[in-house]
């Protein structure tokens, strides 16, 4: 028998080995013991190994903890829990960082990555200010066409802070707009949107979120498409088919939603299968954003605790197979 003192597992444990030498089987042994010990157990498996999933379920059942088990699997979306990887954050800038970190940053790509970060951050700030939770689908929609979000936010802001006659003034300006009297970059925009922009500009109305939307709105559409071209394909992959329903949860779906704070408070068990063999890009993006989310939650717990009145922090055991495929800068 080979024994390992639990005190030796405080911090990180790294297990190295090539294929078929038993690294996953050893992980199963450690996972089984953590489940039976009553820990919060999180298993992240890039390939989505069916045997590992079966072992997690079997051990949870044997420990009387099946009700605590939540399964998120990109390979079986119809049976999977849902998860919004950019919906929870300590700072709003984390939303843009989790998306932009999936983009290449070598050479000339670095500039496009910074542009993508800025525009995603503008969209995320506007959504939160409107009382909406950011998700991949909303980000994809508005990074393709910022105009609807600009109009919504501008109207929301003016309703709260504008003059009593702002609507009439905007309508008057909009009625006089044509392609002959607007800048080339704004040709093709709706007259109502251009009227709002001109009203805000002429009245020197400044608010940080609104200013960001205005600066984006005034770009020529073809130029804007070029500078955010790097993030578009990634978001399309994350928002296509049945995977979109998992990664951008909506209220009408009755499948459970994975929330790390909830998992930790109820001392749950989570199995995550990323199905990397089917789509490496999506698996890497979701896995990296998931780790960034966990790091953010860890920071919240460190500063504020569980927030449920309990002074006792549960033991959290995180098992990540093929960790090198998942790790991002946020975790280091």
What kind of feature is each model-predicted range?
Residues 1-2:
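N-terminal pre-Walker A segment at the start of P-loop NTPase domains
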Residues 6-9, 16-332:
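P-loop NTPase motor domains
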């Amino acid at each position: 028998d080979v024994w390992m003192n639990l005190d030796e597992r405080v911090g990180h444990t790294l297990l190295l080995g090539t294929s078929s030498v038993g690294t996953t089987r050893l992980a199963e042994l450690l996972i089984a013991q953590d489940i039976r010990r009553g820990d919060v157990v999180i298993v992240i498996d890039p390939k989505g190994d069916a045997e590992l999933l079966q072992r997690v379920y079997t051990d949870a059942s044997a420990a009387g903890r099946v009700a605590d088990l939540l399964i998120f699997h990109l390979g079986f979306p119809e049976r999977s829990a849902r998860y919004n990887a950019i919906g929870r954050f300590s700072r709003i800038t984390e939303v843009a960082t989790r998306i932009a970190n999936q983009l290449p940053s070598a050479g000339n790509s670095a500039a496009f990555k910074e542009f993508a970060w800025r525009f995603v951050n503008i969209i995320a700030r506007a959504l939160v200010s409107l009382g909406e939770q950011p998700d991949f689908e909303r980000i994809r929609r508005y990074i393709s066409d910022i105009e609807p979000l600009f109009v919504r936010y501008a109207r929301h802001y003016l309703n709260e802070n504008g003059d009593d006659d702002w609507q009439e003034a905007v309508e008057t300006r909009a009625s006089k707009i044509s392609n002959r009297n607007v800048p080339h970059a704004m040709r093709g925009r709706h007259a109502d949107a251009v009227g709002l922009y001109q009203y805000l500009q002429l009245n020197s109305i400044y608010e940080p979120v609104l200013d960001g939307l205005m600066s984006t709105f005034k770009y020529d559409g073809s130029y804007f498409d070029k500078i955010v071209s790097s993030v578009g394909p990634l978001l399309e992959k994350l928002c296509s088919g049945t995977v979109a329903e998992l990664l951008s949860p909506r209220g009408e779906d009755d499948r459970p939603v994975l929330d790390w704070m909830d998992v930790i408070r109820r001392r749950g068990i989570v199995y995550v299968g990323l199905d990397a063999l089917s789509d490496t890009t999506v698996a890497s993006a979701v896995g990296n954003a998931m780790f960034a989310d966990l790091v953010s939650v860890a920071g919240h717990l460190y500063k504020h605790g569980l927030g449920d009145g309990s002074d006792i922090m549960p033991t959290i055991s995180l098992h990540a197979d093929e960790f090198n495929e998942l790790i991002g800068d946020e975790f280091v």
